[in-house]
Structures are given as C-alpha cells and as structure tokens.
C-alpha cells in the first residue's frame, strides 16, 4: 500500500480529498447560516392574511387584516392562516433546496 493512502492512490490524493470535503462542509455551514437569517413571507386571501417564517422554519409573524375577522366564520380565518403558514414554509424549503442544489451541483445526497 502506498504511504498515507489506499492501494492505487497516492497519499496526496487522499489529502486533496480531505481538503475538498472540509471546504464543502464549510460552504454548507455558511449557506445554512445565511438561510437561517432569511425570512420568507406568504400572503393569502387577497392580502387578508400573511405569515412569515425564518430560515429555521419557525413562524415569526402572522398578520391578519381586521376585516377578515368574522366570529361567525372562524373556520375561514383558520384556513387562511394555515394556507399562509404552509406557503411561507414552502418558500423557505424551496430556497433551501435551491441553494443546496447549487452547492452540490445538483447531486441528490441523502441526509442533506
């Protein structure tokens, strides 16, 4: 076996592979921090309800226009809130997936 490596591979190749893996890990950490600091907002019902989520996928704000608060139709308001939250979470997920694809060159790496 070659010194510092695997059969058929020079020791320098292994060092390069380790450096590339460390660089990739740093890029992923930087991207994750960047996304965690972003906010994603979705508005539904013609502007009646909006929800904002962080890149950590935590709901940070919900805005409801007073005119949509109808005590006789609470179910509609609940549906609007759910829709706004789900849409904002979807935006956050799409952004995360898009950035990950850029970083991995489109490779689908399980667990990332």
UniProtKB/Swiss-Prot annotation:
Pfam families: YbaB_DNA_bd. Keywords: Cytoplasm, DNA-binding. Residues 93-112 are annotated as: Disordered. GO terms for cellular component: bacterial nucleoid; cytosol. It is found in: Cytoplasm, Nucleoid. Residues 93-102 have a biased composition (Basic and acidic residues). This is Nucleoid-associated protein CA_C0126. The keyword Signal does not apply. The keyword Transmembrane helix does not apply. One of its GO terms (molecular function) is DNA binding. Transmembrane segments: none annotated. Binds to DNA and alters its conformation. May be involved in regulation of gene expression, nucleoid organization and DNA protection. Homodimer. Belongs to the YbaB/EbfC family. It comes from Clostridium acetobutylicum (strain ATCC 824 / DSM 792 / JCM 1419 / IAM 19013 / LMG 5710 / NBRC 13948 / NRRL B-527 / VKM B-1787 / 2291 / W). The lineage of its organism: Bacteria, Bacillati, Bacillota, Clostridia, Eubacteriales.
